[in-house]
Every structure is written in C-alpha cells, then in structure tokens.
C-alpha cells in the first residue's frame, strides 16, 4: 500500500513482522554454530556474514530503490534484530523519556556497548565495528511557566537533562564526537498531534492547530504546540543529515 503523504517522494517502507520474536533465538543459534567451526578463516567469514546480514540487505535495497538514506526503528524486545541493526548503522538515535526508568535504560544500553562481558560484545565482527550514538533525544520535556521565561525547561526536566548529560559525559567514547553537549536535544510531548499523526500515518509537519479526529471514541485535537514540535523535529533532522 502507498502512503499518500509520500506519493511524490522516493520513499519506501518495510514493515516489521511477528517473526521478529523468533529472531533472537535464531541469531544466537547461528552464531553458536559459526563459532564451532574449526577453521579460523571460515569461522570469521561466517560470523561476519551473520552479523552484517541486515546491512547487506539494506545496501541491496538502497541500490535497487535508488535511496540514499535509511532509518531503522528497532526495539530491545527484538534483541536479535537489534543486534543486527547496531551493526548496520552509521549512527544511533536514542529516545529517552523524562522518567527514571528511561534513564536506567540509557545506562543499560551504554553498559552493553562498553562491557566486554555483555552479550553484544561477546561476538564481534572481524573489523571490530562498534555503533556510535549521534543523538539522545529527551522526550516529553516540560517548560517553565514563570513570567518572562522563554524556552526554559522546568525543574523536573532540568533534573533529567543533568542526569543525561552526566551519563553521556561518562560514556563519551560511545558517541560520535567528544563534546557531550553535541548529543542531547529536547522534544516536547506531542499530545494530540502525536496520536493523530499515528492514526493517519501522516507526518506531524502536515498537521495544523485545530484539526480534530475521533480515536477510540475520544475526540483528539491538534493544539497550538504543534508548531513548536515541528521546529524541534526540523532541528533534529538537520543534526542528522
């Protein structure tokens, strides 16, 4: 099916699959079998073929569709797929919500990258490829309502910004530059705009304040903050490409 909002663009979408739930076990079995091969050169070749299998498919698809960019949305629940994605990327974008559980998840991710004992580090491609993080997007940020305040995070958001900054600083080797401030961007809660965008499969860039839609018998509205969100998303895009 074609998304009408992308009809004039050279863009293609490859959906996920319920088979992704089986992939972690399949990848683990394949890597285990490859590691048991006695000939070192054959063993290395097989491991590289497995770890770079998704990258090979992406490069083939890009050539066939004449696309220059590829974005992959992955999840820790698809650990095998996530493992292959990490070896397919030039850089990672890590969304972190303004809550402690998300902060803990960021710490866990960076530990997976840095610890030699982690599942991810135990089996590496022969060229030693390690993914680098380009950006941590701190989502659902709140802003000060103090008179005269402009684009000033509220106290709770400032607390999470500081935590993320500390984490990035301690793990700067996992990022694409040596300056922690290059890698943290803030994003508002999308509110109704996000729900309508998802329901319609329509980019937020095309939404306008005042639009309404009924979702699960609840009336949802695009509020005025959508213009601020658009600017934030444009800035994030400019930092990526």
Positions of PLM-derived features:
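Phosphate/oxyanion-binding active-site loops and adjacent basic polyanion-contact surfaces
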Residues: 42-54, 101-109, 225-240
């Amino acid at each position: 099916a074609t998304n009408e909002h992308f009809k004039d663009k050279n863009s293609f979408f490859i959906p996920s699959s319920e088979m992704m739930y089986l992939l972690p076990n399949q990848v683990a079995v394949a890597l285990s079998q490859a590691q048991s091969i006695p000939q070192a050169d054959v063993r290395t070749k097989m491991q590289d073929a497995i770890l770079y299998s998704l990258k090979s498919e992406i490069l083939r698809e890009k050539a066939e569709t004449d696309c220059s960019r590829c974005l992959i949305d992955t999840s820790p629940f698809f650990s095998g797929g996530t493992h292959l994605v990490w070896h397919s990327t030039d850089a990672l974008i890590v969304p972190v919500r303004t809550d402690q559980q998300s902060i803990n998840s960021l710490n866990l991710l960076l530990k997976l990258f840095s610890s030699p004992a982690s599942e991810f580090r135990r089996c590496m491609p022969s060229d030693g490829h390690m993914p680098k993080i380009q950006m941590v997007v701190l989502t659902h940020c709140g802003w000060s309502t103090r008179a005269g305040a402009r684009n000033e995070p509220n106290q709770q958001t400032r607390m999470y910004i500081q935590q993320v900054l500390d984490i990035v600083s301690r793990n700067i080797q996992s990022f694409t530059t040596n300056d922690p401030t290059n890698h943290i961007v803030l994003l508002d809660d999308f509110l109704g705009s996000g729900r309508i965008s998802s329901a319609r499969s329509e980019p937020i860039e095309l939404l306008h304040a005042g639009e309404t839609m009924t979702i699960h018998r609840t009336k949802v509205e695009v509020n005025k903050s959508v213009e601020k969100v658009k600017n934030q998303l444009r800035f994030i895009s400019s930092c990526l490409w």
